[in-house]
Structures are given as structure tokens and as C-alpha cells.
């Protein structure tokens, strides 16, 4: 053991601590150092370190490192200097003790001089900002708005009194005018009234409830309080609402990027818990009920914090009407309501409810043959009957103000509907025909995940850029595919090529995907409300769009008739007769048989290859699963034993029948590649390019006409349906 001496913390030989890169957050611990074999004593309130001479720096080394940096000087006090002097006096070598004392006095003089400079700088800062609120309250900061004036948005400022932050955000996003639902609901929401609002899809409901919450947040004096919570039925919609509100508040987010926070499943709960601890975070929360309930049940403090909100929003609230949906949401209301009642001098929060559909009839299964309506009183509207149902689940501050921006139409007038009648096994062919003839961005909805996977593989085999999203995919993969789809769509729009997104009903509600021209219902949806929300993915804002149903004769006789009757306006119902054929109220999409016939062979090959790919992939998965289960149980699994299970054997045989051998698969792929190289021609014309009604040679040279079909003019599904409607009107006259 070497001789032990008393030393300061700066005289010790500290070792740097390397923090592993795998740690997500260091919790503020940066530049850590450690030392072993040092005793710590507290004498008269002063900390002393007793270490061996080997652990203490040499005099020259310590004099260089001991010179305090700016931050250390600011924090050093007289007690530290006195402690250093006492330790110096305890040194054995008295002859050399005078030099450190001189150095100590010189350093002390420098510290005092720099401290004076720091104090003078602080005084200058205080003179520049005399009001403490300016330094602490983010929302009271005077933001430079020289480029934007309230006169630039008279469509907003003439109706409601908004902050400059909101006006600037709306101006940057190009929202110069209010939509009908915004005009009707925002003034009432700013007054603190409970609202139940109904408007067609794509009509601006997000801002109708978002702006009142943003205004409350800006005017709030408490920067740590959550002002509003927005609940959405799907994760994708929650992400979209969050981005939309963040774009409006982009100026405020420069100071605090986590002010508007999304809390959804499928993403790291640890990261969300960490973000909630940051000062000023989660002023506005956009959440799905499952993840929100998980967070508040783990943390009582979070529950108390969220119980003090000003506004509670339910987006796409009609889902609460469906029995068995969102038990988590009812638990959330009980938890928050219980704490809210215990708080003194706090009235109940403001509740805003919005959706495109508020009718209990719309939730009935279309396959159900019953045509009887709910037993509502004659004077009671659909929204009033829905409100009665909601009041059993939700506590309102007062009776909600009911706002219906489109009382007559259930489907937006900007959506042109159409029907394709085909055999049940020809849905794929007609999908291929539609995206070939009408290139652009198309969203196809299927009722099952297997159909989504198969149709995606089928279109990819035909050389079409296709992407898929469904509930079996992880949240990250869904968002990635949406981003890829949007990027590819912007590229293909210039080239005249189709871009397709195939989805299950996970994408039906609320998702605002830019530039969707067509929505195709590969299957007829199970309920009318799903049809409304699916079709509403097109014709967003002021744009127009097309919704096409692919329907078999069996569906046309039952579910389609019921769907069209439920979607009919009151005027249409009053004029109808008992034997009215409701399926004929939607126009048929014109089909060009010559083009369809050219697509039939390549469609059949692509279908067989797609079925092989899915079946072989599924067989591999099943085999791996069985082997893994057998290994975990310590059992030897033979193929003979697998065949003894009747269900497994049937399932396996069904998939085996869809698979192809290597040579057959190779041959079919080669044949399909050859067919795809053959251009599709209008009227099957192969010679005399300059003859006929259309000069094909001239069109080819001047790059006019259809991108995918030779001799065909550029067509747009929207214009085709508009022309068909106008021709029908002329015939009736």
C-alpha cells in the first residue's frame, strides 16, 4: 500500500466511461468519469477524497487540468477555495508549499474577475428582456409575422377571431377558405360548446376540431398542461392527424417539437413514456384507445394529468355505435371521469364528436335480407337517435350542438360512382383492365387479407407498380409502403403509368392519401358505412374522384340493392315504388371488349403465377411452424403423421394443387414476359397506321394518345362518367 493523501476531485486521475451505442437515451449523463480505491469523507460539511499518491496527478499535470473552465468558474465558491488551501497545508513538503498557494491566489483572482464578467453579462441580458414571461412562456414570444397579415385570409378572419400563429399556418398550407363544416362548427367550438358534427369525407373535419384546441393551447398560461386529447380508430389516422396539426403549428414546434404527440400501438411504448416526461410535451395528444389506456394504467400521474384537459375529441366516432368496439375507450372515460369529478373548481371537459356517418342503419350487414328500419319516432332525425345512443357511453357537459354539413347526401357530390358487372372469378381481370385503361393513382379495397396479398402479387407480375397495406403488417411496414406508394405515384403521374395501393379496411377511415383519383371496391363491403368511408379516400378537399364497384350477379341482387337504398336521399326514397330496382341507380362503366380480350390471356398467366407464389410461401411457413413446435415439445415430426390430421392434410393438398413445378413455372413466366412486350391495340389494328379514323402514325410521332394502348385516345374515368351522365339526361329530354 502506497502513502495515502488528501486530494481535491480535480487532482485525482479520473478514467473516462464509454457509454455503449445501443443505449437509446442516456438520461442526460454525458462525459462520465470514474475512479477506484478512493475513500470519501465529509469533514465539517466539506467533502474530502483520500487516495494513494499514484492516483493523484503530478504537480504540472494538475496545474494544467486544474485551471477551471468557464462553467466551473461560475459554480465555484469560497468554500471550495478554503478546502483547497487546507489540503495544500497538509502536504509534507513545506518548502514547496508556498508555490501552490501563490498559484491558488492567482487563480482565485482570475475566477473573481470572470465571475464579475458573467454577472455583468447577466445584467445586460436582464435589461434586454425585462419581462420574465418572455423567457419562459413559449407561446407569448413575439414571432416575426411580417410576411403574413390577417387580411390575407379574409375567408377565415371574417368569420372567427384566430391567433396569428394559426393564420400563418393556414396561409402556408394554402387553406384560404373555410369549408361548410368548419364555418358551422369552429365558432361554436371556440365558445366552449359540445358539438356533434357530420360532414362528408374529405371536407376538413380535422381542422374543424383541431383549430379550437390549438387556440386554447396558445391562450393557456400553463405550458406543462395537456389541453386536448384526440381519439382515432386507427393508427394511420392518428399519424395523419398529428402531422396535419403539426403543419398548422409549425412555428411553435420550432421551440418544442413534442408539443403535439402521437400515442399509438405498434411503436415503442418506452420512447412514448420518455417523451411524455419532457417539459412542455404532449400539449395536444392524438391517440388510439388501446395504447392510451395502457399508458395511463401504468402511470397514475399521467392519468391525473390527462384528466385536466380542456377538450376531448372523438374522430370517426360512429365506430363507438358498433357493439363490442372500443371497450378500451369506455374504460378511459371512466378513469379520467373519476379523477375529474374529484378535482375542485373544474367543470367537465368540452366534447367534440365528428364523423362522416351517423346512422344506425348504415352499420347493418348488407348480406342481411331484412329491410326494416330502426323504430325511431317520426320526428326524430338520424343524428338525434345516434346522440341518444352516444349519451349512454359519453358524459357531455351539456346537450351537444348537432351540425350536419350535408344532410341530404351521404356520399360527397364530388365522387362519381360506377359499377362493373362481372363473373366472380373475373375480378382480377377487370381490375387489370381498369388500371390499364385509366392510369393514375388507384386505391383498391378488398374484404380479406388473402385477397390483398394475391391481387398485389398478380398486378406486380403484370408489371404494374403495386403496394399493399393490411392489418397483419407491422405499423412500420404499413407506413413504409404508404411512403413508397406516394413517391412512386408522383413519379408515374408524369409518365402516364398506373400506381396501385391495395388495402384492407384498415385504410378505409380518415386516411388522406394525396392524389387518389380512383377507388375500386374489389369486393362489396359488409356495411354501408364502410362503403362511404372507402369511397371517401378520393375527392379530397375541392378535387373530384371516381368510385367503382366490381360486383357479381349474386351481389347485385341482394347486398347491392340494399346498399343503394341506404345511400339514397330522402327525395329518391319518396319517389320510389315497391318494385324499384335500386341496383340500377348507379351507372355502369363502359367496357371496351376488344381491349379486354387482349388482356385475358396475360391475366390468366399472371393469376396462376401469383397463386403459386402465395401457396408455396404458405407451405414453407406451415412446415417451419410445425418443425418449430415439434422441436419445442421434443417430438420427432414425420410427414406421415402430418397427413393423419384431416384438416392439415386438406389444407396442404389445397395449397399443393396451386403450386407449379420449376419447368412449368419458368415456361409460364417466359410466356407472360413475351405477352407483356406485345403492345395493346385499339380495335386490334396491326397494319395501315395512317388509315382509318385515327392517324396512328401521327399520334406515335407526336407522342399523343394513350400511353398503354396504341390508337386509343387519352381517357379519364371521371370524364367518361360525366359524359355518360350528360348523354343520359339528353335522351330523357
Curated annotation (Swiss-Prot):
GO MF annotations, alphabetized: ATP binding; ATP hydrolysis activity; RNA binding; RNA helicase activity
Residues reported to bind ATP: 199-206
Subcellular location: Nucleus, Nucleolus
Boundaries of every Helicase ATP-binding domain copy: 186-376
CDD domains named among the record's database cross-references: DEADc_DDX24 (cd17946), SF2_C_DEAD (cd18787)
Basic and acidic residues biased stretches: 100-126
One GO CC term, this protein: cytosol
SMART domains in UniProt: DEXDc, HELICc
Motif (DEAD box): 315-318
Region called Disordered, residue ranges: 53-132
Placement of sequence motif Q motif: 155-183
Biased composition (Acidic residues): 58-99
Keyword terms of this UniProt record: ATP-binding, Helicase, Hydrolase, Nucleotide-binding, Nucleus, Ribosome biogenesis, RNA-binding, rRNA processing
Enzyme Commission number, as recorded: 3.6.4.13
Catalysis: reaction(s): ATP + H2O = ADP + phosphate + H(+)
Any one GO BP annotation for this protein: maturation of 5.8S rRNA from tricistronic rRNA transcript (SSU-rRNA, 5.8S rRNA, LSU-rRNA)
InterPro entries on file: DEAD/DEAH_box_helicase_dom, DEAD_box_RNA_helicase, Helicase_ATP-bd, Helicase_C-like, P-loop_NTPase, RNA-helicase_DEAD-box_CS
UniProt domain Helicase C-terminal: residue ranges: 428-594
Chief location category: nucleus
UniProt cross-references to PANTHER family, sorted A to Z: ATP-DEPENDENT RNA HELICASE DBPA, ATP-DEPENDENT RNA HELICASE RHLE-RELATED
Domain notes: The Q motif is unique to and characteristic of the DEAD box family of RNA helicases and controls ATP binding and hydrolysis.
Protein family (similarity comment): Belongs to the DEAD box helicase family. DDX24/MAK5 subfamily.
Function description: ATP-binding RNA helicase involved in the biogenesis of 60S ribosomal subunits and is required for the normal formation of 25S and 5.8S rRNAs.
Protein name: ATP-dependent RNA helicase MAK5
Taxonomic path: Eukaryota, Fungi, Dikarya, Ascomycota, Saccharomycotina
